Amino acid sequence: MIHPLIQRLTTTLGYPLLDADGLDRQVRTQPFSVLFFAGDPQRFPEALDVAVILPELVKAFPQLAPALIAGADEARLQGRYGFSVWPSLVFLAGERYLGCLSRVLDWGEYLERIPAILAGENEDLPRIPVLSPESGTPSCSPMETSES
């Protein structure tokens, strides 16, 4: 069962609930999108705070088209955007990744960081470190080799 604060985003505020199949169609039609990856609110209670903050962010940044990512597809889509902390807000220009804000921030941080994300050049997707089998040290690319 979806928590009422998260359900309110779709039922009362009309935010689309996107699955993996509908995501690309939706964001392709929007100049700027913010995707809410809530995760399980029992595991990540900050998701409920972000569910309350998100509508206020949309008021402050009306160019953002908000959407909630369906729980069944969150893990698969998380891999596309490379974040590792829940809850997360992923910002897109069309289908292009712009940035991500994870967990709950102070209101002033949102007001400072979102314009920078929207105005900036597209960020590369974050790289998830891969452990090198030879040395056990983190590497951002499986193509890198450790020197002996």
From Swiss-Prot:
Provide the residue span(s) of the region labelled Disordered.
128-148
* Pfam families linked: HyaE
**InterPro entries, A to Z:** NiFe-hyd_mat_HyaE, Thioredoxin-like_sf
Q: Where is the composition biased (Polar residues)?
A: 134-148
Gene3D superfamilies, from UniProt?
Glutaredoxin
Tell me the protein family, please: Belongs to the HupG/HyaE family.
Q: What is this protein called?
A: Hydrogenase expression/formation protein HoxO
Organism of provenance: Azotobacter vinelandii
> Source organism lineage?
Bacteria, Pseudomonadati, Pseudomonadota, Gammaproteobacteria, Pseudomonadales
